[in-house]
Design a protein with these regions (language model features):
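C-terminal regulatory/interaction regions
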Residues: 107-171
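A structural motif corresponding to the C-terminal end of an alpha-helix
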Residues: 1, 66-70, 154
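Metallo-beta-lactamase
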Residues: 13-18, 22-102
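Active-site HxH/HxHxD metal-binding segment of metal-dependent hydrolases
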Residues: 1-8
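Residue-level signal for tight coil/turn positions that link beta-strands
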Residues: 9, 29-31, 161
């Protein structure tokens, strides 16, 4: 069953907020918008520096979409409910952190690196300890950033000694 407004109970509206997770949605009921993981708290972003993201471009678009949601109260999944002004401030902070990660990946790729080398440098940069869970979460997030940057023409790849290397494109 495809998730569309016509399959929802009357008075409930679907909010397409892809990016943090594939096909992520929120719901609006009356003047309340339930926005799931569309934003992360300052505390989480400050503590970890990098959060799981499925698709960076979609995530940035969803942060912009939040501006257009007509609601009085916004209920994120892991943050206290807030008004629109607070939401827009937090969305701006999420956007800032995402831009910093984009910049960090480009800086780390000033010299060609394999994905594994880049992943290690990301872990070192954010002072994280690698384990299986973090390898999977941050590894897939890093691949989302690589995809975003490659599609934007900001990084490129090459093959050398049977290894795929990523490198920032010099302007």
């Amino acid at each position: 069953l495809e998730m569309t407004d016509d399959v929802l109970p009357e008075g409930m509206e679907i909010l397409h907020l892809e990016g943090h997770a594939m096909d992520m949605v929120g719901f609006k009921v009356g003047n309340v918008a339930y926005i799931g993981d569309a934003v992360s708290s300052r505390e989480v972003l400050d503590k970890y520096g990098i959060q799981y993201t499925w698709n960076v471009g979609d995530y940035l678009e969803s942060l912009e979409k939040l501006k257009d949601i007509d609601a009085e109260l916004f209920v994120p999944a892991h943050v206290a409910p807030m008004d629109k002004e607070e939401l827009l401030e937090l969305a701006g902070y999420n956007r800032k952190v995402t831009a910093e990660i984009i910049e960090k990946v480009q800086e780390l790729l000033a010299e060609p690196k394999t994905f594994e080398e880049l992943l290690k440098e990301v872990f070192d940069s954010y002072e994280m300890a690698m384990n299986v869970r973090q390898y999977a979460l941050i590894g897939s997030t890093l691949k989302a950033y690589i995809t975003y940057l490659k599609e934007a023409g900001k990084i490129t790849y090459m093959f050398e000694d049977n290894r795929m290397l990523w490198k920032t494109v010099q302007d």
